[in-house]
Amino acid sequence: MANQSEKIPRATLKRLPLYYRFVNTLKSKGIDRVNSKAISEGLNIDSATIRRDFSYFGELGKKGYGYNIDSLLHFFKNEISENDEIKIAIVGVGNLGKALLTYNFSIHDEMTITEAFDIREEVIGTQIGKVTVSPFEKITDILSHEQIDVVILTTPEEAAQKVADTLVKAGVKGILNFTPSRVQTPSDVQVHHIDLGIELQSLLFFMKNYSHK
């Protein structure tokens, strides 16, 4: 999907993991077929949006039949690299960093945080889950040796851009940024900003304005 993805809306691409998780749940319940209405009800996404999303990827289903679960699983696995083992590093082992290390994508066998970095002496060398915290000064060598190009950023806001610059120089191609800082990177480095405050404000807005009364 390398070239094709450039023509697909970002919102559609961000929904692919949601579709994959939902379809995988249906598979675990022994269901072998699903239609867009059922997916819509399960994910609270308009069925027209689902059909439009799926249309970007060709014929995934048949009118009157719906979608074959095994076919959808195979497709989504390939599209979101769920068949590949992805090693991830985290920078900043504060409360949020520790929580993410403890969780460590427990429902995703293919994604694992394998490295953690911090600058504080009292944190360096400690083990959280199965990961030992390394000094940040060694990050370039370790990322290169472990072939890691995805990093979760949970540093203090004032350190975020400097850390991001170091990650770019180290060859990182994807950053999941939990800091309030809108870090700047070259166009070939993907950054997804996760601001929990903004997400909560958005939730409250939709609760106030769009909830059924």
Swiss-Prot record:
GO terms for biological process: negative regulation of DNA-templated transcription; response to redox state. One of its GO terms (cellular component) is cytoplasm. Keywords: Cytoplasm, DNA-binding, NAD, Repressor, Transcription, Transcription regulation. SUPFAM superfamilies: NAD(P)-binding Rossmann-fold domains, Winged helix' DNA-binding domain. Residues 18-57 bind DNA. Modulates transcription in response to changes in cellular NADH/NAD(+) redox state. The keyword Transmembrane does not apply. NAD(+) binds at residues 92-97. It comes from Staphylococcus saprophyticus subsp. saprophyticus (strain ATCC 15305 / DSM 20229 / NCIMB 8711 / NCTC 7292 / S-41). GO terms for molecular function: DNA binding; DNA-binding transcription factor activity. Homodimer. This is Redox-sensing transcriptional repressor Rex. Pfam families: CoA_binding (PF02629), Put_DNA-bind_N (PF06971).
